[in-house]
Amino acid sequence: MPNPNPTYNNYTHAVNQRIPDIPAYIQFMWGDYGSRIRLSGLLRNMTYRQYALEGMDAKNKTQMGYGLQLSGNIGLGNIVTFYYQGTYGNGITSYFQDGSGQNLDMFPKQEALNELVTPEAWGGYVGMQFNITERVFASATYSQVRVLSKDGFYQPDYYKGSQYLAVNMFCRVKSNMMFGIEYLWGKRQNMDNASNTANRIQTVARFNF
């Protein structure tokens, strides 16, 4: 059973979830080069425990989360393929790769610390792969994720968003041998708008036996 990834405080507590996340999608494909478009949806039922406060009894409370995603790729012959994905939702931050482990599916409400709210979040990427020859191809991808703080009690260093850029080139020397090089750039921004960037160059060699 999947568990939500919230930020708890002294007035809230985790409980076992009873309803799984519910996904659904529809997809359309066309052409001879694998072009497709997919619309996906997700519903989440996230339950937590409210501790007793003055005039209130302890009880379980549930927040609903949801997500919508549009994704796909467009093949232009055997040379160029474009791919894309866009996601928006409420209480789904852990479904983003950069948001996983940030404890932002829910966090305490400013006006009532024994209540959790679900922040809005959006993200997506665009990319392209270019087949230079039968053995050499290059690709580039740019992605961005953003968590929208609303009615939430959060720390200044909580995750707010990130950007990512990757550019690479690969060469298939033989059917069982491949070499590649990649440049990566990334940026993280916190809720107080403090940010930092990082750069990396990496290489890879793959041999199949």
Residue ranges and their predicted role:
Residues 20-24, 66-70, 122-126, 163-167, ...:
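Hydrophobic, lipid-facing positions within transmembrane beta-strands of outer-membrane proteins
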Residues 1-52:
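Internal metal/ion-chelating core segments
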Residues 153-156, 191-195:
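Short, solvent-exposed loop/turn segments at secondary-structure boundaries
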Residues 165-182:
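C-terminal closing repeat unit and adjoining cap/tail of repeat-based domains
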Residues 171, 197-209:
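Outer-membrane beta-barrel "beta-signal"
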Residues 30-159:
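Detector for outer-membrane/organellar transmembrane beta-barrel domains
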Residues 183-189:
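A short, acidic, flexible beta-alpha connecting loop/helix-capping segment that sits on the rim
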Residues 13-14, 59-60, 193:
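Alpha-helix capping and helix-loop boundary segments enriched in small/acidic/polar residues
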